[in-house]
């Protein structure tokens, strides 16, 4: 990997990596930051920008000066981090389940792997309690810890990102500051997952995030850092079904919600859960539910399927 590919920036500006449609970068306006910096519920810890980059090919950043805390949680793929320690640079390989915590003053650069680019959640943050939380979470002497793919972290970052729907209303950003505090306060209570262990909550959260997609077994196994054989074997031993069966059931469950609550056509519902072929979707739906999507919708609307 060619590492530093762009000039170092001053302070804690976010990267200008070209943002694809399925990724998010949300800088918080200065007027809101001024309010967060003085409000009694947020002044000691609040986000200044946040985002989610999916399979971020060619993503890289270099900062010589850094005046905020930065968290990066890798949920898929790989990357490389370098931090300056005195006159030397130390290098860290970053993988799925790693959480980076880069404090103010730590010169650093990082980049997604060329062949397996990372998927990351990230947030810049400020506040007097941030350093205390950093140390209590075990980051006093290292910028990287492996926690594994834990529901508490995946769900925590996803909750933070809900602020993008707020229309920049202050109360929503105050809630985001509270959620950030909750996320960081959980870290000392989490047990890092051992390499090769299986976190079902984290895996199922990943599945729910990709209900619109076709996730192959190889990708699910890679998400858990396991071979396909060991992944299926462990999953089936715990749940009694295969991971693909569970993913299919999650898709059908979501399709039922859409059929219940919207007037979308069966074809559109199928597309929403990753099936462009409406006939194939209908066959899968019928196999799981025992009736076609149209019959299911008619039954529910006639009052036969509700509480």
Curated annotation (Swiss-Prot):
Biological process according to GO: positive regulation of amino acid biosynthetic process
GO molecular function terms noted in the UniProt entry: DNA-binding transcription factor activity; sequence-specific DNA binding
Top-level taxon of origin: Bacteria
Keyword rRNA processing belongs to the record: no
Statement: the UniProt record of this protein carries the keyword tRNA-binding: no
Boundaries of every HTH araC/xylS-type domain copy: 201-299
Residue ranges the UniProt entry marks as DNA-binding: 218-239, 266-289
Keywords: Activator, DNA-binding, Transcription, Transcription regulation
InterPro entries the UniProt entry points to: AraC-bd, Homeodomain-like_sf, HTH-like, HTH_AraC, HTH_AraC-typ_CS, Tscrpt_reg_AraC-type_HTH
PANTHER family found in the cross-reference section: ARAC-FAMILY TRANSCRIPTIONAL REGULATOR (PTHR43280), MMSAB OPERON REGULATORY PROTEIN (PTHR43280:SF30)
Role description: Regulatory protein for the mmsAB operon. Activates the transcription of the mmsAB genes.
Protein name: MmsAB operon regulatory protein
Source organism (scientific name): Pseudomonas aeruginosa (strain ATCC 15692 / DSM 22644 / CIP 104116 / JCM 14847 / LMG 12228 / 1C / PRS 101 / PAO1)
Originating gene: mmsR
């Amino acid at each position: 990997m060619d590492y530093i590919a762009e000039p170092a920036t001053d302070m804690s500006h976010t990267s200008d990596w070209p943002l694809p449609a399925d990724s998010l970068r949300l800088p918080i306006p200065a007027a809101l930051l001024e309010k967060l910096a003085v409000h009694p519920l947020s002044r000691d810890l609040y986000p200044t920008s946040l985002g989610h980059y999916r399979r971020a090919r060619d993503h890289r950043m270099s900062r010589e000066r850094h005046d905020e805390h930065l968290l990066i949680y890798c949920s898929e793929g790989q990357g490389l981090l370098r931090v300056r320690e005195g006159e030397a640079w130390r290098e860290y390989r970053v993988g799925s389940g790693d959480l980076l915590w880069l404090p103010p003053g730590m010169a650093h650069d990082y980049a997604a792997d060329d062949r397996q680019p990372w998927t990351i959640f990230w947030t810049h943050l400020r506040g007097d309690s941030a350093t205390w939380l950093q140390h209590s979470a075990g980051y006093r002497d290292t910028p990287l810890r492996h926690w594994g793919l834990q529901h508490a972290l995946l769900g925590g970052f996803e909750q933070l990102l809900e602020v993008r729907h707020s229309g920049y209303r202050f109360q929503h950003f105050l809630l985001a500051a509270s959620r950030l505090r909750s996320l960081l306060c959980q870290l000392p209570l989490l047990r890092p997952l051992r390499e090769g262990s299986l976190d079902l909550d984290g895996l199922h959260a990943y599945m729910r995030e990709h209900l619109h997609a076709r996730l192959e077994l190889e990708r699910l196994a890679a998400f858990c850092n396991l071979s396909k054989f060991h992944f299926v074997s462990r999953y089936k031993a715990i749940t009694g079904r295969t991971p693909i069966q569970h993913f299919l059931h999650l898709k059908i469950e979501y399709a039922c919600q859409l059929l219940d609550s919207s007037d979308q056509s069966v074809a559109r519902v199928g597309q929403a859960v990753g099936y462009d072929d409406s006939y194939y979707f209908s066959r899968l739906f019928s196999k799981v539910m025992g009736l076609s999507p149209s019959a299911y919708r008619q039954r529910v609307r006639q009052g036969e399927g509700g509480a």
